[in-house]
Amino acid sequence: MSEFTIVQNKEDLIDAIKSKLSEGYKESEMTVISKTKLHIDALHDSEVNLTATSGSFSDKMAKILTGEDGEEAVLAHYKLPEEELERYKKEILNDNYLVVATKDTTSHVEADKANVAFETNQTKSNSHYSEETNGPKS
């Protein structure tokens, strides 16, 4: 289940993200949805996903030709009831921001165990290498 927070300006946006971090969410579990592309230095090197509903020039042209609604296309990912979808769509069109926090409940342990790129081998006593590996981690 995703938690949606509506904010009206960039300062409140940073505060909302900090609040979600203090609630235990990771940066990678948060998305900021806006009408236009965001340029916020504080989020430049973060893992927070910044999604603009306007898209690129080619996206805009495709929307004109197909009649697709950019806000609805982005919000469809969250499988919201129609009334919530319309409410959040209206907020985006009014130049507000949505901070969406979704807990990642998947387990990544299996991938860590099966990743041969980070598998290490025992060194041979006659070897001049400090460690032999089967991948980029050396």
From Swiss-Prot:
Question: What ranges does the record list as Polar residues composition bias?
Answer: 118-138
- The membrane spanning regions, by residue number, are none
Q: Looking at the Swiss-Prot or TrEMBL record, what is one Pfam family this protein matches?
A: YflT
Q: Where is this region: Disordered?
A: 115-138
In the record, the note on similarity to other proteins reads: Belongs to the UPF0355 family.
Give the protein name, as stated in the record. UPF0355 protein SSP2326
The scientific name of the source species is: Staphylococcus saprophyticus subsp. saprophyticus (strain ATCC 15305 / DSM 20229 / NCIMB 8711 / NCTC 7292 / S-41)
